């Protein structure tokens, strides 16, 4: 019998790849607040669809807004800190899938 986690990943691989591809295609150059915020909105949609959670938004004037997602409850917490702006200028980052990768 296949591990339930591995089974889930195998069953949903195409959906996850499509979400990842869509995220990469949301260009978010650091200096372009509007594009970074659009990428943030896409992330908010992903979190809402897959985890049923909405972020706390910390509006910024020059850079993209900061987002805080709280998932789960309890005394033991894990912090995942990341950014979603990119160092690439607009239209400089290409994506491709070859042989399913």
Describe the predicted segments one by one.
Residues 2-101:
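Acidic/His- and Gly-rich active-site-bordering loop/insert found
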